[in-house]
Amino acid sequence: MVKIRLARHGSKKRPFYQIVVSDSRNARDGRFLENVGFFNPVASGKAEKLRLNIDRIEHWKNVGAELSERVQALVKAEKKNLQTAS
């Protein structure tokens, strides 16, 4: 099964997550099919905290990919921010 999930990068106590499309059998930080964004929970100042490629996420959802709980929450928040910004 294909999943859209977070892959952890960064150093100890400074997490940085890539949002990737991956086969569920692969390791969390292992091989992936496509990188569709990133999430930086410890961003400060003007650093970008979240970037998502919504078009590609929707494409993968239509193909049958399943989103992890955290990615679902991030996508929902990003869509809400886009609606209020317009």
UniProtKB/Swiss-Prot annotation:
Any Pfam family matching the protein: Ribosomal_S16
Molecular functions per Gene Ontology: structural constituent of ribosome
Any GO BP: translation
Source superkingdom: Bacteria
Ribonucleoprotein as UniProt keyword: yes
One GO CC term on file: small ribosomal subunit
InterPro entries tied to this protein: Ribosomal_bS16 (IPR000307), Ribosomal_bS16_dom_sf (IPR023803)
Keywords on record: Ribonucleoprotein, Ribosomal protein
Family: Belongs to the bacterial ribosomal protein bS16 family.
Name of this protein: Small ribosomal subunit protein bS16
Species of provenance: Hamiltonella defensa subsp. Acyrthosiphon pisum (strain 5AT)
Gene behind this protein: rpsP
